[in-house]
Amino acid sequence: MSALQLTPQAASLAERLADLAVDALIAEADLSPKPALVDRRGSGAHTDLHLGLMHSSALSLWPTFKLMADAAGQFNTVGQPLREALGRLGRDGEATMLRTTQGVNTHRGAIWALGLLVTAAALDARNCAPEAVLARAASLAQIKDRQVLVQGSHGNEVVRRYGVMGAREQAQQGFPAVRDFALPQLQRSRAAGSGEQNARLDALLAIMTTLSDTCVLHRAGIEGLHTMQRGAQHVLDVGGSASLAGRRALNQLDQQLLALNASPGGAADLLAACLFIDGLEPALGRVSRSV
């Protein structure tokens, strides 16, 4: 059962946005076959993750996303107070996630990306076109959270070591992987009659073609990143996941990434962001504007 089915029809805007965020996370986890990622087939390149844990983690974040949307209604403008409220809520949400998963990092990157997007959507529910929401999210991400000292993380270490764009920079630029690659590919594959699951797989692959995925870089270095990018492009070049040649290439990419222990977790987070953005306008036409 999806989060959308758990919320009454008279749901507030904040509740509906939380539903959409959780549903995007669950849809990303369920999508199969994803190369070297947790899906319905198994745990991919991970030893500490499984599909049930991904579901539990996603559901545990519903209150966090709702509170973020509520904060947007409270402050009603992009600025330092809202940015720092989001930071506090995100840290609380991460603590909840870690309690739920017994210390396993399932969705830290997704809390950042989807938290910004939920808040950006709540700031102006009457203008939830992708470009508008992504621009508002970028404005929020560009504001420094003064309550946070610079912290070490695998992602930050990789950004410094390789000089690539990390999750923070991706958000500050308006999620170009979503705006310029995932959403257009999702629409192209749907228009080609590929089917929804294949269209979503193609959107994931489109992200993977150019993303400097810090999860892959951390686990497999430059070799892993190039294998991911070139392999994803090859799948799309031979017809995408709906074609026989594309499925063969996708299976080959899966095996290559597994051999390198490289899991494209950053791309998975951005696919969830893509699915959230894609669902906004259809869903918000059916909800109350009250928060």
Curated annotation (Swiss-Prot):
GO terms for biological process: prosthetic group biosynthetic process. Pfam families: CitG. Its EC number is 2.4.2.52. The keyword Transferase applies. Keywords: ATP-binding, Nucleotide-binding, Transferase. The keyword Nucleotide-binding applies. One of its GO terms (molecular function) is ATP binding. Transmembrane segments: none annotated. It catalyses: 3'-dephospho-CoA + ATP = 2'-(5''-triphospho-alpha-D-ribosyl)-3'-dephospho-CoA + adenine. It comes from Pseudomonas savastanoi pv. phaseolicola (strain 1448A / Race 6). It comes from the Bacteria. Involved in the formation of 2-(5''-phosphoribosyl)-3'-dephosphocoenzyme-A, the prosthetic group of the acyl-carrier protein of the malonate decarboxylase. This is Probable 2-(5''-triphosphoribosyl)-3'-dephosphocoenzyme-A synthase. InterPro entries: CitG, TriPribosyl-deP-CoA_syn. Belongs to the CitG/MdcB family. It is an enzyme of class 2 (transferase).
